[in-house]
Amino acid sequence: MGSSLPFDLILEILQRTPAESLLRFKSTCKKWYELISNDKRFMYKHLDKSTKRFLRIENRERVQILDPVTEILAVSTIPNELRHKYFTLIHCDGLMLGMCYEELGSDPNLAVWNPVMRKIKWIKPSPPLVCYWGSDYLGFGYDKTFRDNYKILRFTYLGDDDDDESYPKCQIYEFNSGSWRSIEAKFDGEIDVEVDGVSVNGSMYWIELQEKKNFILSFDFSKETFNRICDSPLYWDIKRLGCFNGDRLSLLQQNEATREIHVSVTNKLSDEVVSFSRYFSVTLPDIPLFRSIDILPLPGCFIGKNRNIIAWCEQLVGKYDDHTSIILYEIGEGGVTKRIRTGRHEADEDYNDLDNCSYVYVPSLIPVPE
């Protein structure tokens, strides 16, 4: 490769190089091409050392990827076949599972997409599925025995003719077989539809609502079972579930009236007993609301290791609220420590029909499963 550096050192450097740069470098020589394109071990080591970004889809035409540390904003066009309205996007290993409408009134479509590599795979319904529904719940993860054995979970609530109760009917899509199959996994609560689920280390997590308390519900793609892993703290109605430190959950809760925030995190999800503990609070009023408001979509956010919140959101500005600004926030216990405008739009109810302003995303070299 024309270098006097030891290959182990070169590997270490490449594993810490952004995926976007590596894709440009892979034509440098045959060895680098094989490493970046085909070496699964290298791909996953690179992924494990990659840092969180934000992904934003703008006007169905462009995808923006923002590095909140360097504040570098990369913009590229969206492939024509993906220029639709999205109402579900789930991130796992740099891959995005998306459910979208091709046109108003049509059945939704399902796709897996690597935004950096610009690769797409459409997931077709197959028996027992006839079509997808907008009311479907989705999960995205992998069998921990083989990390590249990715699976999709789909479930929806149907009435039981025998006792008229609601229960989820579940199917799994395996890329290895290219088809859906029914499974017997069940749980007896309801998913909180106001809070997006999150994929962490191959398993999917949601907030489950029960009459007296809430729980964190997980789906293990290895065992193909649902499990309640712990109670979910209950303070206020605005809630955001996320991945913390790569192997834990975070829960941001906000009081809409005062804008006060409590952030709780779990211990490692692999521990025998999992529970939340208070991480930090923010009590100042000059911080954004972490929910959608009128034409403003849901902010993207994650919890940092320095007891802070990193968010990319949209806010109305101007004398008559006539335009919006896209703003990167960093919020610590003492309040806002960073506020940078990264873009602007005219305020138009139709200009952006996304439910989310942005999504937490980690660019990767992982190919879209065939």
From Swiss-Prot:
A Pfam family assignment: FBA_1
Residues passing through the membrane, by range: none
Source lineage: Eukaryota, Viridiplantae, Streptophyta, Embryophyta, Tracheophyta
Ranges for domain F-box: 1-47
Entry protein name: Putative F-box protein At3g10430
SMART domains xrefs: FBOX
